Amino acid sequence: MAIFNNTTSSSSNFLLTAFPGLECAHVWISIPVCCLYTIALLGNSMIFLVIITKRRLHKPMYYFLSMLAAVDLCLTITTLPTVLGVLWFHAREISFKACFIQMFFVHAFSLLESSVLVAMAFDRFVAICNPLNYATILTDRMVLVIGLVICIRPAVFLLPLLVAINTVSFHGGHELSHPFCYHPEVIKYTYSKPWISSFWGLFLQLYLNGTDVLFILFSYVLILRTVLGIVARKKQQKALSTCVCHICAVTIFYVPLISLSLAHRLFHSTPRVLCSTLANIYLLLPPVLNPIIYSLKTKTIRQAMFQLLQSKGSWGFNVRGLRGRWD
């Protein structure tokens, strides 16, 4: 069965929507959307590649940043086919099975990103509040354990939800408000009582994301208390500057996530075009902005990226030179 096609809707498919009411402008809208996807793919790939290849970046802070880049890259790839399929080819149909698979990965990678942001907050907490023991607390083994917990966490909580959804029947042919499958909207079209799965989804979001947000806030309360206790003003500013990128990453991830969730669960009269816009912001804002923020604010990352680009350029020049000698 095809993942999506542009045929007439059937009872075993959902209809995806990019921007309701703006179908005539989809070709023009696809230009900035495609540019944003390109920036997200190239930016996160570059960040990940730089951290993996440069040995001086093999430190806990950069390990967590590479995890964030990898998650953003995967989240971008998960929704890329359906978003561009709707905008370019009007390929609106998606089968139930493909929808469930995409929905699982969208929510799994979102939960992964939330977990990585928590790990990064812990890293900043240890670096500022307990700098003398930073190397002994965040060892390579500890970073590996944290990474494994981050990967296992979505499977433990989301697989039961996916199994439960797979056992119920759905009304086919309904239009979704997004160019991808999102649990709070998909679950509305079940024949059985949708409130059970909806309640479980709400519980998971409040429990998991809520716990993550509280942990991050608590970490920054302790960080702020430590920074305010520093006498030298320059040292205060330096300590706070190391947290700016992470605070930006937390903001651009949680604000769209919470806004989209509230629009679906509490404000049922929200215009569909607004829901679609929020969905695209939720998907694209973190993957696009995170590489830009970290490359601009982190001198080490910026220098490593320039060095990598220069080495690739010089390698290409040398190859062309060798070809010129033998031609």
From Swiss-Prot:
Odorant receptor. It holds the Pfam family 7tm_4. It comes from Homo sapiens (Human). It is a multi-pass membrane protein. The lineage of its organism: Eukaryota, Metazoa, Chordata, Craniata, Vertebrata. Residues 49-56, 123-141, 220-239, 297-327 are cytoplasmic. It is found in: Cell membrane. Glycans are attached at residues 5-6. This is Olfactory receptor 51T1. Residues 1-27, 78-101, 163-198, 261-275 are extracellular. One of its GO terms (cellular component) is plasma membrane. It comes from the Eukaryota. Keywords: Cell membrane, G-protein coupled receptor, Glycoprotein, Membrane, Olfaction, Receptor, Sensory transduction, Transducer, Transmembrane, Transmembrane helix. Belongs to the G-protein coupled receptor 1 family. The chain crosses the membrane at residues 28-48, 57-77, 102-122, 142-162, 199-219, 240-260, 276-296.
